[in-house]
Amino acid sequence: MKSDKSNLEVRALAKHIRMSAHKARRVVNQIRGRSYEQALMILEFMPYRACYPILQLVSSAAANANHNLNLNRANLIISEAKVDEGPVLKRFQPRAQGRGYPIHKPTCHITITVKNKN
């Protein structure tokens, strides 16, 4: 969070989301640079599973901006949105004749930063 009054930024971070970073980036790329209301509309009507945690995160970032810095939600834009890869959960799938195939369950970390339009 920056202390400059003209360029206040608020960040919300979700870690260890059980989803591939590639699939989450597909959604995050659509809302980067958009206004708060526009991002909510886009996320609500996109048919991807990644939309729900990202929608919660955008709402959390706006709530943080409203509560901590008294910024109006109508004046917020999503200045930065990024998805980083998290740790991979490694499991084994039993197969025929005593074999086991590895299963990789990826996770990701999603960061949303909002700032005032002005």
From Swiss-Prot:
Q: Where in the cell is it found?
A: Plastid, Chloroplast
Q: Which GO terms describe its molecular function?
A: rRNA binding; structural constituent of ribosome
An example Gene Ontology biological process: translation
UniProt superkingdom: Eukaryota
**Sorted alphabetically, which keywords does the UniProt record give?**
Chloroplast, Plastid, Ribonucleoprotein, Ribosomal protein, RNA-binding, rRNA-binding
Of the GO CC terms on this record, one is: chloroplast
Q: Which PROSITE patterns match?
A: RIBOSOMAL_L22
| Cited NCBIfam families | rplV_bact (TIGR01044)
What does the function comment of this entry state?
A: This protein binds specifically to 23S rRNA. The globular domain of the protein is located near the polypeptide exit tunnel on the outside of the subunit, while an extended beta-hairpin is found that lines the wall of the exit tunnel in the center of the 70S ribosome.
Family listed = Belongs to the universal ribosomal protein uL22 family.
Known partners and oligomeric status: Part of the 50S ribosomal subunit.
According to UniProt, the name of this protein is Large ribosomal subunit protein uL22c
Its source organism is Physcomitrium patens (Spreading-leaved earth moss)
**What gene makes this protein?**
rpl22
